[in-house]
């Protein structure tokens, strides 16, 4: 698991460095990273990890805590159906509904934040 965490951290740092260098200024998706980038980032990270010999599953969930029926989606990866790999969870850092989740890289078992989301795809 330590190797996965190191690879995920390296991948996240590369995105952060590109963002700081202005590489995403004209990009409609990544210019606001990590906000609204979880699906695309999970896809890219999955390929990166696969290239390193680590097979992952894409997971998408929706938080349906609002009474108006609208929800908030979030995506991450899983290894062996039990280890979460999430490098965009900090997009929720200023939202108390989502526990002010501020982890830019999370690799581990299910936690309170990820349990908020009803999983749709696995």
Short names for language-model regions:
Residues 1-122:
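A structural boundary/capping signal
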């Amino acid at each position: 698991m330590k190797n996965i965490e190191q690879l995920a951290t390296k991948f996240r740092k590369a995105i952060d460095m590109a963002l700081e260098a202005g590489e995403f200024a004209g990009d409609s998706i990544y210019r606001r990273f990590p906000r609204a980038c979880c699906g695309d980032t999970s896809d890219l990270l999955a390929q990166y990890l696969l290239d390193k010999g680590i097979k992952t599953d894409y997971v998408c969930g929706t938080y349906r805590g609002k009474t108006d029926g609208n929800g908030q989606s979030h995506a991450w990866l899983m290894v062996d159906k039990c280890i979460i790999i999430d490098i965009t969870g900090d997009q929720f850092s200023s939202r108390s509904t989502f526990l002010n989740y501020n982890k830019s890289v999370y690799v581990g078992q299910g936690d309170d934040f990820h349990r908020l989301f009803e999983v749709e795809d696995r």
